[in-house]
């Protein structure tokens, strides 16, 4: 029987699915300014190819899919793909990561298609700072967040990349914003991903210290096993959570540098061109697009997936080899 289990006994149950490498923002830690070397649409996996691959993977143990980019909402009819994936009985959880610039117009369709949860990137609440980080408009993002909340998405997680000298002075403000609107905040350490022209590691901020400061300011309460509801957190990712006393707001800390979580990694990433990446912090990959376009039988596709998962490393090497990963975050799929 073909199963998605890596050489270290970890069950791969989670696919991060990039539907485009394009984005309508230019966050400096994700994509170089002026970058235009995107994959040609002819190289993108079609929705039919994606649906077939996900279907085969669910037979091997896949249970969760997150649609990512680039910015996934720049791809036409992504809600239709979501609907098709959600109707696969093997998929227990379907989520989407977005910068929310187009979310106000698409939230209703995504909700109707069956998307369960949203993760939204938001590094600052200051319009000018937002423009400096992303070259975009903050008001469109805030509109998208509030529209999604009104449509009933729950939970909505805000992903804030914490950066020294960039936005570390408004972490408390961001948590206040989440308390006000009933959102979950996830703090993320910067990672060395490709040469974007501005070294993200120069802005590295150890979140262990941030956690101490927020705990004192907000009276953060530990949750069972560092999760929400004792392990029943929607998504079950790498974040370790604390709860703001007297509220239902949680704040999570994703710490790939200061306290990595590789031993429990249960995910792989599929880029828009059909390349399966085993680790965000390593270059191990396996091309699947040509196999899909040759129309190989499911058994052969399963054998290829077993071979691919066999390449998954034990852990990343961000600390030991910070320049090892040459691809940009936007190419991998968030």
PLM regions and their residue ranges:
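Radical SAM/AdoMet-radical enzyme domain recognition
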Residues: 44-67, 74-188
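Glycine-centered loop/turn positions within well-structured domains
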Residues: 25, 127-128, 260, 286
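A short, compositionally biased micro-patch
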Residues: 20-22, 60, 113, 245, ...
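Short connector loops/turns at beta-strand edges and beta->alpha or beta->beta junctions
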Residues: 24, 123-124, 282
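Canonical Radical SAM [4Fe-4S] cluster-binding loop centered on the CxxxCxxC motif
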Residues: 7-47
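A short acidic, helix-capping loop that chelates divalent metal ions and anchors anionic groups
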Residues: 35-40, 126-133, 194-198, 287-288
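Conserved, mostly hydrophobic/aromatic
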Residues: 19, 67, 274
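Auxiliary Fe-S-binding modules of radical SAM enzymes
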Residues: 1-14, 176, 180, 187-334
């Amino acid at each position: 029987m073909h199963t998605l289990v890596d050489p270290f006994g970890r069950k791969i149950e989670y696919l991060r699915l990039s539907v485009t490498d394009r984005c309508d923002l230019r966050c400096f830690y994700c994509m170089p300014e002026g970058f235009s070397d995107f994959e040609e649409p002819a190289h993108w996996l079609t929705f039919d190819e994606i649906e077939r691959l996900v279907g085969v993977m669910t037979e091997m143990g896949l249970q969760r899919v997150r649609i990512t980019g680039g910015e996934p909402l720049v791809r036409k009819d992504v809600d239709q793909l979501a609907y098709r994936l959600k109707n696969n009985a093997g998929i227990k959880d379907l989520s989407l990561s977005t910068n929310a610039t187009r979310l106000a117009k698409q939230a209703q369709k995504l909700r109707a298609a069956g998307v369960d949860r949203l993760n939204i990137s938001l590094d600052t609440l200051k319009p000018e700072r937002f423009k400096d980080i992303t070259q975009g408009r903050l008001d469109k993002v805030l509109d998208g967040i509030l529209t999604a909340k009104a449509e009933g998405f729950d939970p909505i997680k805000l992903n804030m990349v914490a950066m020294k000298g960039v936005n570390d002075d408004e972490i408390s403000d961001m948590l206040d914003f989440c308390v006000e609107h009933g959102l979950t905040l996830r703090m993320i350490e910067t990672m060395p991903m490709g040469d974007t022209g501005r070294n993200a590691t120069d802005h590295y901020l150890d979140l262990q210290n941030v956690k101490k400061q927020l705990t004192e300011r907000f009276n953060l309460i530990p949750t069972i096993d560092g999760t929400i509801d004792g392990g029943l957190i929607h998504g079950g990712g790498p974040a370790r959570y604390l709860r703001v006393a007297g509220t239902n707001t949680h704040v999570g800390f994703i710490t790939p540098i200061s306290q990595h979580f590789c031993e429990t990694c249960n995910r792989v990433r599929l880029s828009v061109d059909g390349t399966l990446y085993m680790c965000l912090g390593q270059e191990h990959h396996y091309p699947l697009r040509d196999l899909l376009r040759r129309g190989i039988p499911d058994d052969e596709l399963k054998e290829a997936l077993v071979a691919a998962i066999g390449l998954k490393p034990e852990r990343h090497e961000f600390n030991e080899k910070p320049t090892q990963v040459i691809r940009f975050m936007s190419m991998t799929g968030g």
